[in-house]
């Protein structure tokens, strides 16, 4: 497919290291096959130059709906190995946080829908994620109580 570079604009993915390989239309969802690859960095442990090792099993990253169907990105991340200290490292992207599989844009959409007072099961169904993910995002919010005034009517039970 010659137009795969337009997918980054369509999905608003700004990471230049993600290369899209193919799009598969399943019966229930769309799968975008991509790989994350860049030059080997220096080792964060010993400082020597790491080498490209292989790719991880694809991460199944849920993404926003496209053309009315749930979309997920099957992202193969490059692994790097330091031959000096034998440590391994996985390529990182701005699409998702380190050691996470829910993209930042989905987390923003969850927060937006929680503010709109949509039920958690509806949010999970609309974004093709689990209800527990929505609950975890709700627990990330910090609610402040305003104790600067008292209510007009107060009652005590004796």
Please give the residue ranges for each predicted region.
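Short, conserved DNA-binding cores of transcription-related domains
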Residues: 1-87, 93
């Amino acid at each position: 497919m010659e137009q795969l570079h337009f997918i980054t604009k369509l999905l608003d993915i700004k990471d230049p290291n993600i290369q899209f390989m193919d799009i598969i239309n399943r019966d229930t969802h769309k799968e975008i096959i991509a790989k994350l690859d860049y030059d080997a960095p220096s080792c964060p442990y010993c400082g020597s130059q790491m080498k490209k090792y292989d790719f991880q099993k694809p991460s199944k990253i849920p993404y926003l709906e496209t053309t009315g169907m749930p979309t997920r990105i099957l992202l193969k991340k490059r692994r790097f190995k330091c031959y000096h200290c034998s440590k391994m490292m996985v390529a990182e992207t701005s699409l998702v946080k380190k050691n996470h599989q829910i993209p930042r844009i989905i987390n923003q959409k969850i927060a937006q829908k929680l503010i709109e007072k949509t039920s958690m099961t509806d949010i999970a169904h609309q974004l093709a994620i689990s209800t527990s993910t929505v609950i975890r995002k709700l627990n990330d919010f910090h609610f402040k109580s305003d104790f600067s005034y008292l209510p007009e009517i107060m009652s005590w039970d004796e």
